[in-house]
Amino acid sequence: MADTSGEVAAVPASGAANGLSNGAGATPAQPNNPLSRKLHKILETRLENDKEMLEALKALSAFFVENSLRTRRNLRGDIERRSLAINEEFVSIFKDVKEELESINEDVQAMSSCCQDMTSRLQAAKEQTQDLIVKTTKLQAENQRLEIRAQVADAFLSKFQLTSDEMTLLRGTRGGPVTEDFFKALGRVKQIHNDVKVLLRTNQQTAGLEIMEQMALLQETAYERLYRWAQSECRALTQESCDVSAVLTQAMEALQDRPVLYKYTLDEFGTARRSTVVRGFIDALTRGGPGGTPRPIEMHSHDPLRYVGDMLAWLHQATASEKEHLEALLKHVTAQGVKENIQEVVGHITEGVCRPLKVRIEQVILAEPGAVLLYKISNLLKFYHHTISGIVGNSAATLLTTIEEMHLLSKKIFFSSLSLHANKLMDKIELPPPDLGPSSALSQTLTLLRDVLASHDSSVVPLDARQADFVQVLSCVLDPLLQMCTVSASNLGTADMATFMVNSLYMMKTTLALFEFTDRRLEMLQFQIEAHLDTLINEQASYVLTRVGLSYIYNTIQQHRPDQGSLASMPNLDSVALKAAMAQFDRYLSAPDHLLMPQLNSLLSATVKEQIIKQSTELVCRAYGEVHAAVMNPVNAYKDPESILHRSPEQVKTLLS
């Protein structure tokens, strides 16, 4: 590049311009001219793509500041001098670098000598401590092995042994409390006892058996302590408001694994609650509630039904409360028979109140407050027996047995009272009253029956039991009543007796019609009423026929035989007698109500009276029809029969209807 620059600088400016114009205007005359080739090369060079050229020009511009002939001629020398100065400077700098490197080399040589010395010494030391290294390696391996064994031992102990704190919790002190941590420790013992069975299937059977025995002893110790604590807690539950703690509930859950201790604890709870319930019952009877509200139950002893009802209601509430307490106590117990345990303990708790309850109810029943009250008390006892049995659920419970005994006693006294009443009816039978209405004894007995049935209808005794009682009550009352009425009317005439019986039976029927389960009895009474109605219907028809003079004529016609001759030839059946009878019959037809038996006016039921009149009228019409047919029959030799009987049977029916 220096040579090129020098040559370029030596060419005059005008010449260069002429050369360029000549080269551009025509084909070069001397293509092989070196200068021309260089110029063409320079002119064809693309400086933007030649980075080295650009850098060289930039460097040249730094010291080539004046473009003159002199500077162009001396350019080569200037560049060489500058290059020499730069090289001298480079040599000077590298001399310093060399000196530094030599210093470093000396240091490195010293360090190398030191390292060789140390290596030699270490090699010597290594040769001298070879045995120690071997021993150290062995000890390290042994230490690692022992650490692994220690970890295994720690894991084994944590898996199959209790901590000292857990041991202290399980053994505890005699009167110490039981906390949540106790149950966690007990659960840990159970878990270890189950997990140790894995060891029995390995070569560690001896260790497994020892651990199992140790855990079994700890379990027994813990259960014994838990049992004593639970017993103490149960003995303290003597307040009416029994608050079962969560810890005691957990204790019962844990004790279910020891059925004997579990049973003893339940018995202790039942004994404590039994004394509480007995004390509460006696207080309710004699002292009442806090501050005298509610009042003592004994204050209502003058009202037998309320007295018995209040006692039973208190016991029902107490029984339900005790069952709730037991359910709270055993809510976490999962063993079979929990329901039976609750029923058994509730039965034991309520057993203590049976004696005072029985004595008081017996006093009420044996005082014979009356059949109605006895029946209400009987139904009340039956209802509470059914209700409490839903809580106790065991028919063998003493409380249920006592209530059932009192129910049977009240029922027995009730039916004895009814039987006594019935016997009194038969011992002193009253004559029917002059109006042939029901007797006072019948009215009183039916009032009693109505009150009994009304109390029975309003009771909450189960349906099947109510129906059975109904049948027995009706048999005990109605059968003697019917017998009394029959005996009482036995000395009366036919119509009077039938009227009295219809009135009595009608009153019985209207009384029973108000109540359920009486359909069968109502049917029986209706059959008897209809039998006596038939009698009254016949009597009324006979009464009418007798009063109008047709009775003899009708009876004779019915009994007449053809071999006796014609009816007209028989005594009192001639035309004159028939015309006289027809005259009376016409008066009857004009006012039939004037020929009613007096007994019909004594009937209590207007419907029955109308029925008798209607059906007896039909009998009269039928009798007239037979008389009319006989008179109109030529065989009977009546002359001009139309003048004797001038009305046809249809006309008679029309007039009487």
From Swiss-Prot:
Low complexity: bias regions: 14-26
Region (Disordered): 14-36
Subcellular locations according to the entry: Golgi apparatus membrane
Keyword Membrane: yes
Record-level GO BP terms: glycosylation; Golgi organization; intra-Golgi vesicle-mediated transport; protein transport; retrograde transport, vesicle recycling within Golgi
Cellular compartments per GO CC: Golgi membrane; Golgi transport complex
Bilayer disposition of the protein: Peripheral membrane protein
Protein family: Belongs to the COG6 family.
Physiological role: Required for normal Golgi function.
Protein name: Conserved oligomeric Golgi complex subunit 6
Organism per entry: Rattus norvegicus (Rat)
